[in-house]
Amino acid sequence: MSYRKRIPAKVLFLICAIIGAVCFVGIYGFCILDPSNTGWLFDNDHDLRQHYIGWCHFRTTPWHFPIGLIDTLSYPNSMSVIYTDSIPLFAVIFKIISPFLPQIFQYFGIFGLISFMLMGGFSGILLRRFIDSDICCIAGSVFYVISAPVIQRMFYHTALGAQFIVIIAMVLWVYNDVIDSDVKRTVYWGLLGFVCVGIHSYFLPMAAMFLLAVVFTQLVKGKHYVRSFLPFISFCAAGLLNLYILGAFYGGTSAEGYGLGTFGSNLNTFINPWEIGSILPRLPLQNDFQYEGMAYLGAGILMLFVIVAIGMVFRMVRKVPEESFHSDRIYGRVTIVLALVSFAIAVFPNISYNDIKIVWFPLPQIISRPMSIFRSNGRLIWPAMYILMTCAISFTAYTFRHTKIGIAVIFSALIFQIADMTPAFAGRYAVYTSEHPIKTVWDEGEPAEFVSGQKEFIFLYTDNDITMQTAYYGYLHGMRQNNYYFARDIEDKITGTIKLYNAELAGGNLRDGAVYILRMKDYEKDREFYDDLDADMLKSFDHVMLKAVGSGQ
């Protein structure tokens, strides 16, 4: 395609990035960009609290190797900041300068802004590969910035809102022939592998789909065998290196998770607005956890597909000769395969449409075990979704390539897309521009007096009912604890330490500076045992707290 009389790619990137920033502020407001504004993080979704509190305890953990370990949330078991989804790359950067930062500090708002800007910039560059009109590229980039999965994930599973990583992988794929050296190609993919882990490891398989497409096309075109695989080697090596540096393998933590098939994608995912769209009717899911595979294209993109389909029929009936859309057909064929692979991985093994389970394929262990590393396989639908989005915008521009109608159509579709999602935007704006005071169960009255001057919380059970707010109070007052909610289950380890604590209690030994916490129902089961301990006791908020007599004084 011709690239004459076009603005420079860097300028296009900057314009689209600025538009991304405008979209971010329009949806979330300015308040969350204040690093000292943390109430919205705590007084919101359970997972968002996990991310923020993980950062809080990570910054106070002394440096040691691996550098990503947190010592004070599951003491004596250290866990990686990877498993609190605290955006490890940002966590490490800000921990370096932590001595110069105030105690109340968050980087999640800034991360969201940067993500929106990069999403805008790189999507504009992606569309530039297929569309001659810079205006269409700029307008088209907004579809990516406000894509349903981005809006769904941002400030929920915040790290997963950084879907610009998928777009970067697509850019490296479609511009593969433009990259003029194997060294650059290898370095780019290596950096991407490193960044994937530094933000969220689920981006590894998504980016890898496009990387394998690069390797395949290199081989088909007769490129040198070893040099064709260098990007793949660098990507894997960089990803594994960062996992090791951040402590993903520390202490024998299993990367596998339970629930493969439960967290998949529904066959209705591209047309189901879930809670993001408002124009189309919301469709049921086979189970509530299929929200993980939400990939709603939006009313505007679906409109573009209808227009493109009508245009294709019109050209066939009128026998209008086709012009080459891309210089090499292999890209189109591989792109179709990529979309199908992404879709298949996301919907297997639980194939369902709406609330009907069509079939559940039993998977052999040799397949299920590695797939369990990415148990929320529904997320892997995003490459397919962005491929479809790119096709809708690019084919629309191609259909009207000799007129300015394409610009009008894309802008009309964008307005339709924004109208479809406006209620979701408005709801988020209201939440994130409001004040959210932080309050824990330990802040006032008898609980505050009871824990004053203590050094650690010891939970005598494995549930996560008050672990979050306890961890936040502990951060502010220099206290550690033995139980926390992580992205990977370490209940066996926590149970093991609880047995040791119970053995100490059975011997009449209470640790100085420790506050023991048990649920009221557990206390009632063995009331005589706990009452006979030489301990101070407090009963509050359906829990019982114990500490050694005179502890902390």
Label for each model-derived stretch:
Residues 113, 117-129, 135-177, 185-218, ...:
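Membrane-embedded helix bundles of polyisoprenyl
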Residues 415-495, 506:
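Extracytoplasmic
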Residues 222-229, 307-358:
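Membrane-interface helix-loop-helix junctions at transmembrane boundaries of multi-pass membrane enzymes
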Residues 23-118, 151, 157, 161, ...:
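Membrane-interface coil-to-helix junctions
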Residues 1-34, 227-232, 317-338:
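Start-transfer (signal-anchor) and selected internal transmembrane alpha helices
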